[in-house]
Amino acid sequence: KKEGFEIELPAVGHRTGFAATYKSNKPGPTVVFLAEYDALAGLGHGCGHNVFGATSSLAGAALKSVVDQIGGEVRVYGTPGEEGGQNGSAKGSFVKKGYLNDVDFALCVHPGSGPEDGLSTRNYACAPVDIEFWGKPAHAAGCPQDGINALDAQILTYAAVGVLRQQLTDRIRIHGVIVDGGTAPNVIPEY
C-alpha cells in the first residue's frame, strides 16, 4: 500500500490472499508477481515459502518504480496455500476466477538447488485433471459378484501413473489424490 498499489484483501476466497495492482498511464504489458506464503502443515517453511512472498513483493515494488516511464501494469498476488490449503491453492483460485486472463507475464521465485553463484530457471505448467470412476455397488460379503468396484479402477490407475514416473524426466511432476474411496469396507464402491 505504501508503494501506491491498490489492495484487494481478502482475495479469491482466501482470508490471507491479496491482489495488489498498480497501473501506469502508458500502455504496456501486465506483469504479475506471485507471492507464495503460508507454511505447510507439519513441515513449516520446508522449501522456502517464507522467502517467496517477500521476494515477489519486493520485485513488484521494484518494477513499479519504473513502470510509469516504460508503461504497463504491475500486480502482486498473495497466494497462500500454494501446495493446497484449506481452500486449495490460491494460485489455482486466481486462475479460476480470471485474474490471470489479461496477464502477459506471471513470475515467481523459488529458492532451491542451482548454480552457487547464479540463477537457474524452471517452468512448471499446471494441468489439473479430474478422473472419475463409476462402478456398480454391491454388498462385499453377500453378493460381491454383482458389483463393479470403482475403487479398484482408481487404485490401478494411481499405481500405473506411479510406475510411469520412472520414465519421466526429473522436471516432470505428477501428483494425485483419491478424494472418494467408498463409504464402508463391506460395500463395493460405485464411485
Model-identified regions with their sequence ranges:
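Histidine/acidic-residue-rich, glycine-tolerant segments that coordinate divalent metal ions
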Residues: 17-21, 38-51, 57, 70-190
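A non-catalytic alpha/beta surface segment that caps or lines the substrate-entry region
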Residues: 1-26
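Histidine-anchored nucleotide/phosphate-binding helix
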Residues: 56-64
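Solvent-exposed, charged/polar functional surfaces in cytosolic regulatory/catalytic domains
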Residues: 2, 62, 160
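Short coil/turn segments at beta-strand junctions that form active-site/ligand-binding loops
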Residues: 28-29, 72
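Short beta-strand element of the alpha/beta-hydrolase
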Residues: 30-34
